[in-house]
């Protein structure tokens, strides 16, 4: 068992090393997109399925609540948290449209729409990102594996270089924490 524990920790460290190297410029670009949107009075909309939904909700909680700094709330919406909306849209339009209908309702040009998908192939996330771009939103996708079909529709795909879902999710939450930290610093420390 100890060998497996060490192997998993080694795999985690390899993902973190990749984030530090090849993904750092893309993370910086994501921070800039979010900061610019907030400075312009826009909002953040975030979505995912399963574990990615948990990450999306975590991201939104840090923006609306706070990450590290005592500051004003930042507008952000997790698109998977209202069960009545999800079940109504899912029943009437199909599961693939549960996020795109909400983007249609809530997103405005200049908003940042973030899709999270470990496989990069979640149809409901892809449809929502496509509609968001049509509406003039900025789009970020946190992906894994080879980025799947979503990498070609997101303005800024951040692909965690792993085929192992837990490692991809660890990469995603690390990216989310970095974005939250730097957005707060840019808006409430440097921006003063």
UniProtKB/Swiss-Prot annotation:
Catalyzed reaction equations: 2 D-sedoheptulose 7-phosphate = D-glycero-alpha-D-manno-heptose 7-phosphate + D-glycero-beta-D-manno-heptose 7-phosphate
Cofactor annotation remark: Binds 1 zinc ion per subunit.
Pathway terms, separated by semicolons: Carbohydrate biosynthesis; D-glycero-D-manno-heptose 7-phosphate biosynthesis; D-glycero-alpha-D-manno-heptose 7-phosphate and D-glycero-beta-D-manno-heptose 7-phosphate from sedoheptulose 7-phosphate: step 1/1
Catalytic activity, EC: 5.3.1.28
Source organism (scientific name): Citrifermentans bemidjiense (strain ATCC BAA-1014 / DSM 16622 / JCM 12645 / Bem)
Binding site for substrate: 49-51, 62, 91-92, 117-119, 122, 169
PROSITE patterns membership: SIS
Record localization: Cytoplasm
Protein name listed in UniProt: Phosphoheptose isomerase
Complex formation: Homotetramer.
């Amino acid at each position: 068992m100890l060998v497996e524990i060490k192997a998993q920790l080694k795999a985690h460290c390899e993902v973190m090393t990749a984030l530090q190297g090849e993904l750092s410029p893309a993370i910086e670009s994501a921070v800039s997109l979010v900061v610019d949107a907030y400075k312009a009075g826009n909002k953040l909309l975030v979505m995912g399925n399963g574990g990615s939904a948990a990450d999306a909700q975590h991201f939104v909680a840090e923006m609306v609540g706070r990450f590290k700094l005592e500051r004003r709330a930042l507008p952000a919406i997790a698109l998977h948290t209202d069960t009545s909306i999800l079940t109504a849209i899912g029943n009437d339009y199909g599961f693939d449209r549960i996020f795109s209908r909400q983007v249609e309702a809530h997103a405005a040009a200049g908003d940042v729409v973030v899709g999270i998908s470990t496989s990069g192939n979640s149809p409901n996330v892809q449809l929502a990102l496509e509609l968001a771009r049509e509406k003039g939103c900025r789009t970020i996708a946190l992906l894994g594996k080879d980025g799947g079909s979503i990498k070609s529709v997101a303005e800024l795909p951040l692909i965690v270089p792993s085929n192992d879902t837990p490692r991809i999710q660890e990469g995603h939450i690390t990216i989310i924490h970095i974005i939250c930290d730097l957005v707060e610093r840019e808006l409430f420390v440097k921006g003063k």
